[in-house]
Amino acid sequence: MERFKFFAWPFYIVCVPVIFLISCKQKKFIYKSPPHYNFSNEFRDKLDLRIKEISGIVWDNQSDEFIAHNDEKGIIFYLDRDTKGIKREFVFSETKGDYEDIAIAKKDVYVLRSDGKLFRIVTDSTGKQNTFDAGQLQSSGKNDFETLYYDAERKALVILCKNCSTDEKKVVSAYAYYPDSIGFDNKALFTIDTKMVDSMSPRPTSRFQPSAARIHPILKKLFILSSASNQLVVTDLNGNDENVYMLAKKIFPQAEGLTFKSNGDMYISNEAVSSKAELLKFPYIQ
């Protein structure tokens, strides 16, 4: 019996590390990309230091350029479609604020402030730009918004709660703004079930907080970024969850902006972490 123990002990010492290493290898997390994209094959552009704190970006199909804005300053920047350099800028508000996202409805540009206020930027036939107060969502309690997108079928701009007190962290509410008629509808357009997001996520986080969203021009699905949880959530246009993808921190250190070109190419902006902000391009794969 003693002899068996003598030979079994070295075997145990050798096997345990081997089993441990195999176990670690099996647990290595694999990041998956949504259909038609490869998130490990990005094209990366560094952005001007003036938009170091880029909070939103949108592609303008009519002018064939990107429009972006900073987090705290009331300035929008027009970026060259190829170099991503700043072509021109426009001060839409002299007041510092928490400006979170940008969208285009028809020909007008809209900027969302975190308290649910919208700014409308109109360019007339001479090229002169003016800013108008487009209204503010009236909702009880403390509310924080970071996401604004345009729904062409509804003919409405939609804002998503990042953290709204009435949601009680159980859902994420969406509210519609109708620029051609009533303005804001203070009743929720739809809600996104945060528990469902967690149940579908490869890594449940309980931190789903939308930071940007756009409707895919080809797939007609809603793509939602959540920087806080490093997730890309795909839903139908009524907020019903369909897929959840985890975003690698080394590629998306602080993903704050999302937009698409009409051909399906996806662009995600990273706010600067150490030096310059970035704009990542992910080509649409047929």
Regions found by a protein language model. Name each.
Residues C24-Q286:
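Sequence/structural signature of beta-propeller domains
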Residues M1-H36:
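Bacterial Sec-dependent N-terminal signal peptides
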